[in-house]
Amino acid sequence: MFGVKDAIFKIKRSIAGTDSSDSTAYTTASESSPQLKDSHNPFRNKTTSERTIVEEGSLPPVRLNGYLPSTKNKLLTPEMCDEIRTLMPTRIQLYTEWNLLYSLEQHGSSLHSLYSNVAPDSKEFRRVGYVLVIKDRKNGIFGAYSNEAFHPNEHRQYTGNGECFLWKLDKVPDVNISEKEESEQEGKEGKEEGDKEERWRFSGYPYTGVNEFAIYCTSEFLSMGAGDGHYGLLCDDGLLHGVSNPCQTYGNEVLSKEGKKFSIVALEVWRVG
């Protein structure tokens, strides 16, 4: 049912060590990233072996919970979730329930409110994931995945592990090559520019192993990734402005369409599982 057996089989195969962890079924910057640390890096070995790309169509569909009927800025759709979860650990990919913990529109623009809303229940011991989603003024959609809830750490300590990653989604034309060739052969006119269908193209930037600056949050900002004095992604305490730079932790590109500095139009945090 929904290919769940397929996915469970892949988990067993992953545990047995017979699957290929870092598949190229998604777009990443790993080829251009700085050289990874050696295989003795415990921070890296702890997580990357668990990451598997499950075959398309074999995962159960995602259900999004938490949007109010009055919410105007709804940043995610199940189709977008399918793209984002390709880089998650296999067991997290299998969760069908994505629960909205924080929304800039629904809960107000405050980093303190974000931390309060995403704080896990002390009785909850199940392993889950967290997805940060941001929309900028040019309608760019990007964000991050975290293995733990975002929380302030005033001791200048980085948290998180090698499961974390940065990502962005771009709308691109959905071109069917076979249909295009058939149309050209028959001499038919193609669709008008405005009628072209589009799809989401996912670009993921997984942990490189170069450093261990996965997550760093304080009462003044939330950030993921760093190196050479630059943050991969940073949001200020008012959740009004942010910064995105290429960083060593994730080998990422600038995530926002606005450039290295961007304005936050909408922001959400989801719990996966």
Swiss-Prot record:
* Annotated organism of origin: Saccharomyces cerevisiae (strain ATCC 204508 / S288c)
Stored PANTHER family: MUSTARD, ISOFORM V, NUCLEOLAR PROTEIN 7/ESTROGEN RECEPTOR COACTIVATOR-RELATED
Function summary? Involved in protection from oxidative damage.
Protein name (Swiss-Prot/TrEMBL)? Oxidation resistance protein 1
Domain (TLDc) spans 74-273
Give the Phosphoserine positions (modified residues): 178
Q: What is its main location?
A: mitochondrion
Q: Which InterPro entries match?
A: TLDc_dom
Q: What induces it?
A: Up-regulated by heat and oxidative stress.
Q: Which family does it belong to?
A: Belongs to the OXR1 family.
Point to the regions of Basic and acidic residues compositional bias.
37-48
Where in this protein does the record put region Disordered? 18-48, 177-197
